Amino acid sequence: MTDQAFVTLTTNDAYAKGALVLGSSLKQHRTTRRMVVLTSPQVSDSMRKVLETVFDDVIMVDVLDSGDSAHLTLMKRPELGITLTKLHCWSLTQYSKCVFMDADTLVLSNIDDLFEREELSAAPDPGWPDCFNSGVFVYQPSIETYNQLLHLASEQGSFDGGDQGLLNTYFSGWATTDITKHLPFVYNLSSISIYSYLPAFKAFGKNAKVVHFLGRTKPWNYTYNPQTKSVNCDSQDPTVSHPEFLNLWWDTFTTNVLPLLQHHGLVKDASSYLMMEHVSGALSDLSFGEAPAAPQPSMSSEERKERWEQGQADYMGADSFDNIKRKLDTYLQ
């Protein structure tokens, strides 16, 4: 169907790798809808050419250069830059209905049935289920809605500093108005929630249709061993309690995306890259100049509490399972 589309967004070359894997997984599961990727000016020309081989439409979104009120909103609230870029998906009025998917999602089976849903359909957020998670949602492009969202962003901002807070404020009736707009969790399975509710995952995880790699560490940040076809990761990392999803992401990347990157000169020698015992030595070649994450400054207990309440616990560091267990043990002794 040419009037319906899956839409994603990439704001740099690193997330473009995620978008390419997402697009490849949609194709692998034989979607009949068009595929669109919105890109910011930070995406390189060479990477944009790779995106054009996977997606039907590659659309540059430069909020600073836009002629609409998005530019004025950005001047007023510069912290919402990426959010305003994502909101541009509502301006794609050449399509009657779309499904937006973040670039850190992976499709596990055909999900074209999502187009039977109405705006705004989304799955609950694992951190606060009365809010929906904006990583996967069904929507209807509309210039009127787009302008209203821009106005809301300008006047009120976002309670979480990102698109999810803004969209939950705009579609505030989602929690109680119409249960048919609540997508089953299997359409947006959070990799972190697997760890937090393992029994449910064991019972229902086999039905997962989309996995969402939430958290600071994305699939492309791990190292991968092509000989064992598995990621090299810390067994205590809560986001990899079930690394088969990470392995599946990397399998899709090495099979479908890596050859495209090589063809366009973004990876010089894929064969020697894959012959390495580990990819850690070549990871910089695939990170396109990504700098390693800077060490996080220490925060007060009050700041840490606020981050927990906002669903931003540092599962990879201070709030890891081992650290929490160690703290509890000191109180229980």
From Swiss-Prot:
User: Which pathway, per its entry?
Assistant: Glycan biosynthesis; glycogen biosynthesis
Where does this protein reside within or beyond the cell? Cytoplasm; Nucleus
- Region span, Interaction with GYS1: 284-316
Q: Which UniProt keywords apply?
A: Acetylation, Cytoplasm, Glycogen biosynthesis, Glycoprotein, Manganese, Metal-binding, Nucleus, Phosphoprotein, Transferase
Q: Which sites bind UDP? A: 9, 11-12, 15, 77, 102-104, 212, 215, 218
The effect annotated for residue 324 to A is: Severe loss of interaction with GYS2
Q: In this chain's numbering, which residues are marked as the site (Important for catalytic activity)?
A: 86
Where do the annotations place Mn(2+) binding?
102, 104, 212
- Keyword Transmembrane helix carried by entry: no
Q: N-acetylthreonine occurs at which residues?
A: 2
A biological process from GO: glycogen biosynthetic process
User: Where are the Phosphoserine residues found in this chain?
Assistant: 44
One GO CC term, this protein: nucleus
Q: How is the cofactor bound?
A: Divalent metal ions. Required for self-glucosylation. Manganese is the most effective.
Documented effect of changing residue 308 to A: No loss of interaction with GYS2
Which InterPro entries does the UniProt record give? Glyco_trans_8, GNT1/Glycosyltrans_8, Nucleotide-diphossugar_trans
**A single GO molecular function, which one?**
protein homodimerization activity
Outcome following mutation: residue 315 to A? Severe loss of interaction with GYS2
| Quaternary structure and partners | Part of the GYS1-GYG1 complex, a heterooctamer composed of a tetramer of GYS1 and 2 dimers of GYG1, where each GYS1 protomer binds to one GYG1 subunit (via GYG1 C-terminus); the GYS1 tetramer may dissociate from GYG1 dimers to continue glycogen polymerization on its own. May also form a heterooctamer complex with GYS2.
Role summary: Glycogenin participates in the glycogen biosynthetic process along with glycogen synthase and glycogen branching enzyme. It catalyzes the formation of a short alpha (1,4)-glucosyl chain covalently attached via a glucose 1-O-tyrosyl linkage to internal tyrosine residues and these chains act as primers for the elongation reaction catalyzed by glycogen synthase.
Give the similarity note: Belongs to the glycosyltransferase 8 family. Glycogenin subfamily.
Q: What is this protein called?
A: Glycogenin-1
Q: What is the species listed in this Swiss-Prot or TrEMBL entry?
A: Mus musculus
